[in-house]
Amino acid sequence: MGIKKFRPTSPGVRQMTVSTFEEITKVDPEKSLLTPLSKSGGRNAHGKITVRHRGGGLKRHYRIIDFKRNKDDIPAKVASVEYDPNRTANIALLHYVDGEKRYIIAPKGLKVGEMIFSGPESDIKVGNALPLINIPVGTIIHNIEMKPGKGGQIARSAGNSAQLMAKEGRYALVRLPSGEVRQILIECRATIGQVGNLDHENVTIGKAGRKRKMGIRPTVRGSAMNPNDHPHGGGEGRSPIGRPSPVTPWGKPALGYKTRKKNKHSDKFIVTGRKR
């Protein structure tokens, strides 16, 4: 999928780029796989903001995605590759021979008309889903389960992939997109190949209006606020923050502060930490 640039007819489009959507083969989604999607505006059940800079945006329907890939030994034909506004990756519509339809994350190289399978006996082919125990070492994979039967949770965004490094007893060693090497149960499933839409990272938003359509509101600098709103606020003119290092609106260190819980139960499954 390529990137389209524009002539600088206005300041907004001078730097803006968009995807050419060459991989998309169908515009209208499958209605039976749509569900309403309500917006929270970053508020919790009490109406308090728990995530800042959220609100507005265009209306969307949620596409029900099959992350579990548990329909074993039944052939499925790739009917179309579609755009999904809820994620960076594209999605592929599968028509199973028994009449059922499902969406999956579209991997790189998946073509309309191909037949794909799920299950331990499936071939090592792009789009097929197998348990890690049945996948050869060195294979590029995505949509990886953390717990058997729970559904894929790792390597699902555009261009992402992981690699199966080794198998040791009950666990497989998988190198994640972050560079972390982690133990995962060999019964967990993964899909062969790399997630498609690789050029997503090269898209330049270009103007604030596109961010607003995505449901993202402006981020105000703390130094532009009053002292009762932010630790960086106040002062005459453009004042320094008056602290050794920047902090969050709640006074926590803002840069390089580790937020992962210490002594977390899953730490024992991390063989090599992620790149920093």
Curated annotation (Swiss-Prot):
GO terms for biological process: cytoplasmic translation. One of its GO terms (cellular component) is large ribosomal subunit. One of its GO terms (molecular function) is transferase activity. PROSITE patterns: RIBOSOMAL_L2. Residues 219-276 are annotated as: Disordered. Disulfide bonds: none annotated. InterPro entries: NA-bd_OB-fold, Rib_uL2_dom2, Ribosomal_uL2, Ribosomal_uL2_bac/org-type, Ribosomal_uL2_C, Ribosomal_uL2_CS, Ribosomal_uL2_dom3, Ribosomal_uL2_RNA-bd_dom. Gene3D superfamilies: 2.30.30.30, Nucleic acid-binding proteins (2.40.50.140), Ribosomal protein L2, domain 3 (4.10.950.10). It comes from the Bacteria. Keywords: Ribonucleoprotein, Ribosomal protein, RNA-binding, rRNA-binding. Belongs to the universal ribosomal protein uL2 family. Part of the 50S ribosomal subunit. Forms a bridge to the 30S subunit in the 70S ribosome. One of the primary rRNA binding proteins. Required for association of the 30S and 50S subunits to form the 70S ribosome, for tRNA binding and peptide bond formation. It has been suggested to have peptidyltransferase activity; this is somewhat controversial. Makes several contacts with the 16S rRNA in the 70S ribosome. This is Large ribosomal subunit protein uL2. It comes from Alkaliphilus metalliredigens (strain QYMF).
